[in-house]
Structure formats: structure tokens, C-alpha cells
Amino acid sequence: MEAPRAKKIEEKLIKDGDVRIDEYFWLNQREDQKVIDYLNAENQYTNEMMKDTELLQKKLYHEIKSKIKEDDESVPFKFNGYWYISRYETGGEYPIHTRKKENLNEKEEVMFNVNEMAKGHSFYNLAGVNISENNQLAAFGIDTVSRRIYTIRIKDLNTGKLLSDKLENTTGGSVWAADNKTLFYTRKDETLRAFQIWKHKLGTDQSMDQLVFEEKDDTFDTFVFKTKSRKYIVIGSSSTVSDEYRFTAADHPDDDFKIIQPRERNLEYSIEHYGNDFYILTNKDKATNFKLMRTPVEKTEKNNWTDVIAHRPEVFIENFEIFNDFLVLEERFEGLTRINIRNWDGKTDYFLPFKEDVYSAGIGRNPEFDTDILRIGYTSMTTPNSVIDFNMKYKTSEVKKEQEVLGNFNKDDYETKRIWATARDGVKVPVSIVYRKDLKFGPDTPLLQYGYGSYGVNMDVYFSIPRLSLLDRGFIYAIAHIRGGQELGRPWYEDGKLLNKKNTFNDFVDISNYLIENHYTSAKHLYAMGGSAGGLLMGAVMNQAPELYNGIVAQVPFVDVLTTMLDDSIPLTTGEYDEWGNPNEKEYYDYMKSYSPYDNIEKKDYPNLLVTTGLHDSQVQYWEPAKWVAKLRDLKTDHHLLLLKTNMDAGHGGASGRFESLKETALEYSFIFKLEGIKN
């Protein structure tokens, strides 16, 4: 079957005298039948080219699914007199959310059976479940399109009936005031930016709602939450480099909101309330890796803030949790998370002990102050996800749950370690790898290298059931902790954004070279994968070093950087000027143009490539991957596979059911196995 060829229609994109010719610009017309026809033709071609893997895809799907415990439930947590539990039943794609009053022996109360709610929808997402103070009402958000636009409904938990209230065009989240009849929520504008906080009174039409706050700066997003103490409702507004918060008492929802500290560029802070103070995690006073401060509720401006935990250049504070007797810090040191426990009198100061060399740990859900029990999450590439309750007073721990892996899984069959590759500028970059203990490394060993490297998002190690299907077929799996993430602290992020963005791509390529030079694999057997901004990474490394990879999987890739960042009518653009740069300024325009994958396709050989996207994707518009594939097909000089798979129903996150998404994984793995000559 011949590959589809998209029609060329020349579009001149002119910016300050610079002319770019985009022959596939027309693909951004979602309503044009010719666009739909082209996407369908690409899907048909992908299906045809992958036809010889259909049995393998089915096998992989069932292999992965058979390891997942179908009737599974979360560890209960207690909040405001009720225990909350989510569970899955055999055959169910979606969770069932339940609760029990006071103790776990009480009768179960089903709040939401999402399997029932999702009937008749190809995509369904329930989000932002929020229970009123009197425990009688639940507000929740629903998205049935995967555009991340939610309608909020309210359910009476006594009768099981939905109230008539219907709040459209929201983020899905909401906050109840103490009166059980006032609800605060966030609305989105046409670019899907969260820009307004509204106040809704129960039983009234949305047209009667009151606008409480509007964020007029389009580089900021706004949100609303309630403090852990449940005493204050807080409106936050954040950009990439600054924050601003305002608050009002939860039992006085009609009072004006008072600002905590007006926004200043490069002043970042977040807040929590305890006792008579707000506790503030901030980079104030050049605290690059953040410090913890506090200020009285009556005097919140920054000149009143005092240090609780001073800044330490080598330790990055990511999160904190307050208890009556203890302060808990989630920190990052030398690329690994650690949990520091201190009591308020200063006599106790210790770290939770973790046995593995490479792991990921984080503070879990801890809604109560008056307890000595800290709940954390723990995982590694060989240890399934675990929920642990740690007694901070007696230093004892109880594993409440370790994710069950069915079949003959034995974690002792696998090994994980961290290695350090030296980048071209001399910086050492950590890489986490996992493999079967009986695997021998060499030039014929297949290796899948994964990366992201943007927004300060950490690619921490985690356990994955699907990944076992790679490892058990002789693969090494590597996570590249490249610059642009925050694994080694805030400077690691700063060194991989704006005019340092190319460090992200260079790190990934240099890690690939390191893995080849040190005989973990060879270019014939090296594969790369990344999604969204990690898809940009895939496009950039493919342009820079196509000879290093046998195959690449680019999931919902952000590949037309310049055109997207010049279009402030589409989601995320203006809010991301502090991540990529503002292309209306020549220095940033030129720099982005020099690495944007779509603008740098050349007549040369490229690796085998599978590209995935969703027609309704709001984060990376479908036309970016579509245009990229069309242009690659026209210019590339090789006979390698080039496949585009568009999910015509889903958005950025792919399919919504827990098993449906495994079919996407099965396709991606089958693509790699096909290239590797693995048939089962």
C-alpha cells in the first residue's frame, strides 16, 4: 500500500521580514472534510503497515491486562468523619467511588459508579470530586470530549439525585464554603486558560453567579482551593515565574478576598495555613532551591515573612506537610527524593530510611493535623507502587498496600541502577535503568530510552506493569533525567528552558552516545520515546542525530514550536512565553526556529517513526503531528516506516478507560518489536 501524500498548499508565514513557507498549514482546519479524510488515510496506512503485528498487539494487550488486578481498591483515607475508598471491579474500565461513616465496618455508600456514568460515551472523565462541610453534597466535574473542559454537577448524597445546578466551561474543580450552599469554581476562556473565579449559590442558575476574580494577564492561570485547616478559601494565580494569592474566611464567603503578597516577577510562593500563620514555600531572597517561611494571618506582606527552614543551595524543597507535632519536608538531594521529619521543638530531625539506591517517594494524602501518622507513596522501577503509613513518633512503618502484580512476577528477577552520562558541556546527567538480572549487555541488546525535560517536570522512576513486557523480551529501559526537569533542583530546570533549551536535546543525544559507547546497546537496537514536550524532544533529537536510533515513538508531539507560539488564540501559548520564550522578540524567534522540529526537516535519512495524536487534543493540537508527518514523508530519503495514528475520539491523554489505553501501549510496543524482529 502506498503511503498517503498530503496536498501541498503554499502558505507564507511572515514575521518581521522572515518568511517561512508552510505547505501543510491547511491541515489545521478540523472542520474540513479533506483534513478528516487525510487523517483517516494515515490511520488506514498505519493499520496496513502494522497488520503483521495484529496478533502480537492482541497478545501484548492480554499479557499486560492479565497482570493487572481487576478488582482492586485504594487505601482508605479519613476526612471530616468519613472514610473514602475508590475501587475497580472485574471488567470495569472506570472506578467506583465510595465512603463509610466513622469506621470501616460501616455500610458502604456508593457516591459515583463511573462505569454507569460513562455508558454511551467513548471518552469520559470524572474529576474534582468535592464534598460539602456537612457531608451531604458532592460537587464534581465531567468531560466527555477530552478537551479538558468540564461541566460541574452537584449530587445529593442522601437521595442519590442530581441537583439542577449546572456549571459549564470549568476546570472541573470547585470549593465549598462552610455554609454548604456557596461554591467557588474556575472558568476557562476560549484558549482554555483558567482565567476567572466565580461564586455560585446552590439552586440558582449559572447566569446569576458572581465573578469574584478575573486574571487579566494572559501569562497567568488562576485556581481556587481550601486550606488544610478548612478555615480559608484561597484564590491563587500563577505564571511560570511568579505567584499571587488572596484569601477569605470559609465561613464568610461573601467577604472580599485579601491579597497575601502582590505578584512580583521572579517571586514564586505557595501557601498553607496552620494555627495563626500562613506557611510559605518560596524562592524569596534568591532562594533558588526554595525555603520555608511563615507570616501571621494579619500581616501577610513579604516584609513580615520569617524563615522556618533556611535556603540550602544543595537541597531543593519541593513540598511540605504540617502536623500538630511535626513538620515534614519533601526534598530532592542529588537527584533523589527524600523525606525529612522534624518536630516543632527542634529535638527531632531525621530522614525516612529507604533501602533501594534508585527510588521515588513523596508525601501522600494527609488531611488531618492531629495525628502522628504520615502517609507516603513509594515506588521504584522494580518495586510496585506502595502506600506506607509511617508513625513519626515511634518511627515505625506499615505498608498499607503494595500494587499487586498477577502472574509469576518476582521483583528479584529485575535490577535497577543509576548511571551518570557526561554531556558535551561537561555536565553529568543522571540516567535510571532497569533490566532483567539475567540479561547480558552488548551491541545486540535492545534499549528503549525515555525522556521529557520541560516545565521543571521530574521524570522520577516508577513501577510499570506494561514495561515488564519490554524487560521480559530482553530490553533495557532507561529514563533520561535531562535538563529542563527539576531532578537536580531548580537550576537544572533553568538550564533547560528559554535560551538554554537545546541543553535538553543535547543531553538526550549525549546519553544515547554514552549508552552505545559503553556497550549497553548499539544504534541498530536503540529506540527512543517521548510525549507532548517529550515529543518535541523526539523531533529535535531526530533532526540532530537520526543515525543513533533504529526507531522513535513520538506521542502527541509538540513539533511546530514557532507557529504555535506565534498563535495566541490557541491553548497554552501566552502562558508559556516564560518556558520557551516570546517569539515576538527576535532573539527568541531565531532560537526557537533553530530547533523547532517542523522547521528543521531536511532531505536525509530518518529513523523508523510512529507518531500518535488525538483529534480533540487541547494541549498539542492534532495538526502539529499531522503536518510534521506530511512534511517528513515528502523530504525524507529513506525507506523506513513513517506512521501516524490519530485517535479520532480522544484528546491529549488518550483513551479514558483503564484497559482501553493498553491498546495504545500495545501498538507502540509492537512497532518497536517489529523493528527488533520480535514476533511474539
Question: Over which residues does each language-model region extend?
Answer:
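Cap/lid segment of the alpha/beta-hydrolase catalytic domain
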Residues: 115-129, 140-147, 161, 390-396, ...
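Extracellular/periplasmic catalytic domains that process cell-envelope and extracellular macromolecules
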Residues: 18-19, 103-104, 470-471, 602-605, ...
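Short hydrophobic segments within beta-strands
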Residues: 86, 281, 330, 377, ...
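Beta-propeller folds
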Residues: 1-373, 377-385, 389-393, 410, ...
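Active-site-proximal cap/loop segments of hydrolase catalytic domains
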Residues: 479-680
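Short beta-turn/strand-loop junction motif enriched in small, turn-promoting residues
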Residues: 83, 88, 116, 143, ...
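Glycine-rich His-Gly loop
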Residues: 88, 283, 379, 450-454, ...
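Active-site lining segments that contact anionic ligands and/or coordinate catalytic metals
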Residues: 221, 230, 242, 266-268, ...
